[in-house]
């Protein structure tokens, strides 16, 4: 009995989306958002691979001028003092 109710509800939902013509529009929007998200992650990955050596070198030079050691993580430069003297 539960299976019949489930399939009946599924048919009603499918018919509702098909009649309104929204089924393909909703799927297209979801696909566009998903593809934009994937492209954004790929772009961010490419930028970090290309930009990290330059930013890390700048960070090391910046912290060296303060007589500290620099470390770059996720485009964030942090300087740390070595020793207590």
Curated annotation (Swiss-Prot):
Keywords: Disulfide bond, Ion channel impairing toxin, Neurotoxin, Potassium channel impairing toxin, Secreted, Signal, Toxin, Voltage-gated potassium channel impairing toxin. Expressed by the venom gland. Residues 1-20 form the signal peptide. GO terms for cellular component: extracellular region. Residues 49-85 form the BetaSPN-type CS-alpha/beta domain. Residues 21-37 form a propeptide. It is found in: Secreted. GO terms for molecular function: potassium channel regulator activity; toxin activity. The keyword Cytoplasm does not apply. InterPro entries: Long_scorpion_toxin_alpha/beta. Contains 2 domains: a N-terminal domain that is unstructured or forms an alpha-helix in presence of membranes and a CS-alpha/beta C-terminal domain, which consists of an alpha-helix disulfide-linked to antiparallel beta-sheets. This is Neurotoxin beta-KTx 14.3.
């Amino acid at each position: 009995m539960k299976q019949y109710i489930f399939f009946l509800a599924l048919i009603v939902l499918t018919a509702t989306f098909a009649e309104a013509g929204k089924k393909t529009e909703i799927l297209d929007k979801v696909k566009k958002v998903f593809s934009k998200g994937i492209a954004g992650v790929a772009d961010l990955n490419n930028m970090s691979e290309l930009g990290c050596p330059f930013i890390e070198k700048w960070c090391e030079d910046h912290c060296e001028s303060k007589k500290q050691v620099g470390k770059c993580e996720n485009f964030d430069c942090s300087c740390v003092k070595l020793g207590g003297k």
